[in-house]
Amino acid sequence: GGLARLEKIIKQHEPNYVLLELGGNDALRGYPPKKISSNLVDMINIIEISNANIFLMQIRIPPNYGSRYRKAFESIYPRITETTSAILIPFMLEEVALNADLMLPDGIHPKETAQPLIAEFMYLQLKPLLTESN
């Protein structure tokens, strides 16, 4: 879905910054990590044409997907940032996901009470990068 919509959105909004936080749902559906990686790289290529600064968020998936798939999936994010202009941002739910009180019963999505923690985390991650690029 994201790849199909991205070019139109980039042309419409002409952003200076783009944060890609995608791939998790594809992983939860068991899509091949190589395909997810290819889609993310295609998206980054579209964004690079617009000269926007690109941040790519590391995505993690639950351990019940098996260590082999999990490692293959989670390793695509650092690899992509080694070969593109995207800057890797740590997974925003790293601390939140470990606290059941902050997560919905599905164990994947955060509760409303987690939002201030996520906002603070994102602020701390992005502020130095935004300041650096201005």
Task: Please describe what each predicted stretch is.
Residues 1:
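N-terminal beta-loop-helix "entrance" segment that forms/cooperates
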Residues 4-134:
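Alpha-helical cap/lid subdomain in secreted, periplasmic
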